[in-house]
Amino acid sequence: MLKAFVEPPLDDFCINRITQALKRYAPSDVKFVTDEAAANLVVLYAHGRRKHIWWTICRLKNHHQRAAVVQMSLKSTPNSQTADWLNVWEEAALVWSYYDLPHLCQEEGNPVNFNFYHAPLGVDATFFKESAFDRKYVIGIHSKGWSRESLEEVVTAARAVGLTVLNFESEKDFGEGIEYTGLIKNDDAALARYYSQCKYVSGLRRVEGFELPVIEGLMCGARPICFDLPSYRIWFEGLAEFIPEAGGRAQIIPALINLFNQEPRGVSHAEKNLVKEKFNWGHIAQGFWERVYG
């Protein structure tokens, strides 16, 4: 029997989704433990400094424990080159990322000597489905701060065309033209109802990120908007509207105004079925466990 420790290091919306899926779709001979010291396999979530992951892997190795790394971010970390992470990945039993890490290694001239699982994050179609609401918000966005997730650009563009933004956060003093859901991130049914009231959903995270709202919003009939980056196109090609990031606010705001001035492409049943298949948490989590055992 494999004893696995998969608990998140912090209360993070995205990591919690991964943890839930790993537990829900694990083989019957996996036992989950809440004490890291009792585990044969420890899942680590890499979203910040490399050294913390590296120190943990070294400590686990000294205790004859294996580590699996979920590479949540790379370009936005203080160690943004693949060479910085090679020793981490090579020591891990498995590395899972939405990034094509072997391809990035090859582009940077680095060897690929690690067990890799290339997979996206997922969506639960049981909860995320379209409801019959008026789409009174031009776009829904998850953003805690004015300068994060492109909230400033989104709100500026929406105000220019006289439309309202829905922010999936607690209320803040960001001025008119924004409404708030309050903290509902752990309530999938409520999230789905709000997504169903949005014409667009924002996937406008700068630098990197998988952007769960893209696929959750799509299942609820909201068309995603993403920056035109390879890490987004590889998963969302044909599903999202892409706008350039490189030109900054001077280019982003007019691109958003152009989209907000037109009705979004309707999300078809075929697209929803594609999302269900491509981003199925069951398939994704089972693939992880198969590679751990493989």
What are these regions (language model features)?
Residues A93-K129:
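Donor nucleotide-sugar binding/catalytic pocket of nucleotide-sugar-dependent glycosyltransferases
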Residues D124-T126, A132-Y180:
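Conserved catalytic-core segment of nucleotide-activated headgroup transferases in glycan assembly
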Residues R206:
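Aromatic "clamp/platform" in nucleotide-sugar-dependent glycosyltransferases that forms part
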Residues W89, R193-C198:
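Short alpha-helical donor nucleotide-sugar binding micro-motif in glycosyltransferases
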Residues M1-T56, I225, L229, E245, ...:
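N-terminal pre-catalytic "stem/leader" segment of glycosyltransferase-like enzymes
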Residues Y25-E107:
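Extended catalytic core of nucleotide-activated donor transferases of GT-like folds
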Residues G247-A250, N261-Y293:
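A charged, aromatic-enriched C-terminal amphipathic alpha-helix characteristic of glycosyltransferases
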